[in-house]
């Protein structure tokens, strides 16, 4: 790769910062030779970095005196904490000192700061969190994952465009199938938001397949599922809770039965492969789509592997020119976007 792509990591965001962020950054720098800027308290970061062999690694520190906590409001993150780690990270992105930002901190604050400093892509009214979920065949993109709890139909239509571009160039889906999440596949189903979004998407150039149900997210029969952020976040939390509950229940049943223990020993490779497939750490983070820059939002409880993979995903998003491709697709969907506006968004 000829292009130098530098990733800024909000090293103070998340439940286990900065240790997890530093460990993940070191792993990503070592494995993929990614230049990384850790943003946060210089003293704490120096202390954690001293535990690692950094020879040959391109890791720098940018000092930030404040931290946006999980209970801080997005408005406070924008207006009051102007030297927070997440704010400084996006300042670096805005100034083109880095090409992507990764954060496991307050997701609402991350989105607010990203929008405030980097602005929206022309033609996008609401940036969205695109979450990658495993399905029986590969992966499904779900958006919005929680950034916008109240949406209008044209927002969902824009989510479909953003998700389709991401699925095509990041997940290798040549012609991504896009569906609106509803309570049934029939056109008479759904609430007003879903039905109106359905009408808009039918008129688009996307490979729109109509309404899809919750079970379809994991079937592999749809590549991009759009919904408002309230529904999307509920879907994610239910999926996460169900996965943990099934694992715990299965583990409990195995412990109670001798033959089950023996069977588990034989099936251990399959269990490990399954666990890896459904582990959020393997997917790193959720891209924040729709801002003029690349942002990756990680789970607050992310481990080092999740941070490492999020850094890699961020680098790949920049390498694949996701924003440029999104601007081009928006131009196809909205011919009224003038050439000069599109060019401004790409610059």
UniProtKB/Swiss-Prot annotation:
<dbReference type="GO" id="GO:0043811">
    <property type="term" value="F:phosphate:acyl-[acyl carrier protein] acyltransferase activity"/>
</dbReference>
<keyword id="KW-0963">Cytoplasm</keyword>
<dbReference type="InterPro" id="IPR012281">
    <property type="entry name" value="Phospholipid_synth_PlsX-like"/>
</dbReference>
<keyword id="KW-0808">Transferase</keyword>
<keyword id="KW-0443">Lipid metabolism</keyword>
<dbReference type="InterPro" id="IPR003664">
    <property type="entry name" value="FA_synthesis"/>
</dbReference>
<keyword id="KW-1208">Phospholipid metabolism</keyword>
<comment type="similarity">
    <text>Belongs to the PlsX family.</text>
</comment>
<keyword id="KW-0594">Phospholipid biosynthesis</keyword>
<comment type="function">
    <text>Catalyzes the reversible formation of acyl-phosphate (acyl-PO(4)) from acyl-[acyl-carrier-protein] (acyl-ACP). This enzyme utilizes acyl-ACP as fatty acyl donor, but not acyl-CoA.</text>
</comment>
<dbReference type="Pfam" id="PF02504">
    <property type="entry name" value="FA_synthesis"/>
</dbReference>
<dbReference type="GO" id="GO:0005737">
    <property type="term" value="C:cytoplasm"/>
</dbReference>
<dbReference type="GO" id="GO:0006633">
    <property type="term" value="P:fatty acid biosynthetic process"/>
</dbReference>
<protein>
    <recommendedName>
        <fullName>Phosphate acyltransferase</fullName>
        <ecNumber>2.3.1.274</ecNumber>
    </recommendedName>
</protein>
<comment type="pathway">
    <text>Lipid metabolism; phospholipid metabolism.</text>
</comment>
<dbReference type="GO" id="GO:0008654">
    <property type="term" value="P:phospholipid biosynthetic process"/>
</dbReference>
<comment type="subunit">
    <text>Homodimer. Probably interacts with PlsY.</text>
</comment>
<keyword id="KW-0444">Lipid biosynthesis</keyword>
């Amino acid at each position: 790769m000829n292009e130098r792509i530098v990733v800024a990591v909000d090293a103070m965001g998340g439940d286990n910062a900065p240790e997890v962020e530093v460990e993940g950054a070191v792993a990503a720098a070592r494995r993929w030779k990614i230049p990384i800027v850790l943003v946060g308290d210089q003293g704490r970061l120096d202390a954690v970095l001293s535990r690692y062999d950094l020879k040959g690694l391109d890791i720098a520190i940018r000092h930030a005196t404040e931290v946006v906590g999980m209970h801080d409001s997005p408005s406070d993150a924008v207006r009051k904490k102007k030297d927070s780690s997440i704010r400084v990270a996006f300042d670096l992105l805005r100034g083109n000192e880095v090409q992507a930002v990764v954060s496991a901190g307050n997701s609402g604050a991350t989105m607010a700061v990203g929008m405030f400093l980097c602005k929206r892509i022309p033609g996008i009214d609401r940036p969205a969190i695109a979450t990658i979920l495993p399905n029986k065949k590969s992966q499904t993109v779900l958006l919005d994952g929680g950034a916008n709890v109240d949406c209008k139909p044209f927002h969902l239509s824009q989510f479909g465009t953003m998700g389709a571009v991401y699925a095509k160039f990041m997940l290798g889906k040549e012609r991504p199938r896009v569906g609106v999440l509803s309570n049934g596949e029939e056109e008479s189903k759904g609430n007003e938001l879903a039905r109106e979004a359905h009408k808009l998407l039918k008129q688009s150039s996307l490979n729109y397949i109509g309404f899809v149900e919750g079970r379809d997210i994991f079937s592999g029969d749809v590549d991009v599922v759009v919904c408002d952020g309230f529904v999307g976040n509920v879907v994610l939390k239910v999926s996460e809770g169900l996965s943990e509950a099934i694992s715990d229940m299965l583990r409990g049943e195995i412990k109670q039965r001798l033959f089950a223990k023996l069977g588990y020993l034989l099936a251990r490779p399959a269990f490990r492969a399954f666990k890896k497939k459904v582990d959020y750490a393997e997917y790193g983070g959720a891209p924040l789509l729709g801002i003029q820059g690349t942002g990756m939002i990680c789970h607050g409880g992310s481990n080092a592997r999740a941070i490492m993979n999020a850094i890699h995903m961020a680098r790949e998003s920049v390498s694949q020119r996701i924003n440029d491709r999104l601007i081009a697709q928006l131009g196809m969907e909205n011919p009224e976007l003038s050439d000069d506006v599109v060019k401004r968004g790409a610059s």
